[in-house]
Amino acid sequence: MKVVAAYLLAKLSGNENPSVADLKKIVESVGAEIDQEKIDLFFSLIKDRDVTELIAVGREKMAALSSGGGAVAVASGGGGGAAPAAEPASVESKKKEEEKEESEDDGGMMSLFD
């Protein structure tokens, strides 16, 4: 993702042919590391292709994916509502465990300093 973002930033800034050095400079300017293999793979995949063409193809693929994934989104949305109800029970059990541990750590002093 860093490589793609750096490439698009270079293109948006007016650099018609960003080089490997340009991408490294952009990524390293924000303190991130970049993998040379990923850069090489990226440039081999986009060789002789236009960015707007690549974006258009990507949009078409995303549109095709989103039309088939509607049922999954609905199913996962319903399951998300049950999670908060289960969470307080786990919090309560953790509190009980902590209280139990504290009482055991008294060393027989029966909460002398509480």
UniProtKB/Swiss-Prot annotation:
Q: Which residues carry this modification: Phosphoserine?
A: S103
* Span list, region Disordered: 74-114
* Modifications made to the protein after synthesis: Phosphorylated.
Looking up Gene3D superfamilies in the UniProt record yields:
1.10.10.1410
Q: Which InterPro entries match?
A: P1/P2_N_sf (IPR038716), Ribosomal_P1/P2 (IPR027534), Ribosomal_P2 (IPR044076)
List, in alphabetical order, the GO biological process terms annotated in this UniProt record.
cytoplasmic translational elongation
Cited Pfam families: Ribosomal_60s (PF00428)
Keywords of the record: Phosphoprotein, Ribonucleoprotein, Ribosomal protein
Question: GO molecular function: any one?
Answer: structural constituent of ribosome
Q: Name one GO cellular component term.
A: cytosolic large ribosomal subunit
Q: What does this protein do?
A: Plays an important role in the elongation step of protein synthesis.
Tell me the subunit arrangement.
P1 and P2 exist as dimers at the large ribosomal subunit.
Homology family: Belongs to the eukaryotic ribosomal protein P1/P2 family.
Provide the protein name.
Answer: Large ribosomal subunit protein P2v
- What is the originating organism of this protein? Arabidopsis thaliana
